[in-house]
Amino acid sequence: SDVCSSDLTVGQKGKEMTEMGEMVKAGAVAFSDDGIPISDGEVMRLALMYSGQFGVPIINHAEDVDLRGNGQMNEGRWSTRLGLTGIPDVSESIMVERDLQLAEYTGGKIHIPHVSTAKSVNAIRQAKEQGVNITAEVTPHHLYFDDSSLQTYDTNLKVAPPIRSEADRDMLISAIADGTVDCIATDHAPHTVEEKENPFEYAPCGMIGLESAFGATWKMLSANKISLLDV
């Protein structure tokens, strides 16, 4: 039978859960509201409780939307130099910490997508050591680029979560090497040339990931002595 992931909440509104049990019977293997974070902690608690019962992971875009605000890139030295509104790394790690604690509390199964910060890696590593049922992924573009790459205002590098600092990137590579991060996923999100030709502030988030995924990943990991078999 066909398998797929399903919306976690009705209309991806983050308020009313879908019928997880019926969806699992129909072939759903995971639940997610895609790029819309579940901000309501009680909804996430219930989702994780059911995920433990049904044996399927909850995938939550880990981002505090209030902390993100109208941010355009990673908050730091380069956002200041480029005059672009920054997105603090804690906008991700705060949500990761919440979800990890809820997964531990409920016995649920959580998957953290597109991890981008050192703070998140540290939280995931600690949770795994404590036996929390968790998996995590990184994207090729978060392994390949750092926020200095945005100095050309290339809108193709405007993604969510944003490209982070060199220190964050180095931590992501280390997390693959030691198994804290379980897999690499493209987060493939193409847009038209016309959309990406808008000024940086108005261009949509997302980049093409399929064509360059292996090449970019292998270049960075091989340079850090990670074997092809591990990749």
What positions do the PLM features span?
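Glycine- and other small-residue-rich loops at beta-strand/loop junctions that grip anionic moieties
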Residues: 12, 33-36, 60, 88-92, ...
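His/Asp/Glu-enriched, well-ordered alpha-helical/loop segment
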Residues: 81-109, 156, 177, 183-184, ...
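Structural preference for beta-strand elements that scaffold enzyme active sites
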Residues: 29-30, 55-59, 109-111, 133-135, ...
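Active-site gating/metal-coordination segments in enzymes
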Residues: 11-49, 157-163
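Acidic, glycine-rich loop-and-beta core segments that form the ion-binding/anion-interacting portion
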Residues: 114-167, 173
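Short, small-residue-biased leader/transition segments that mark boundaries at the very start
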Residues: 3-5
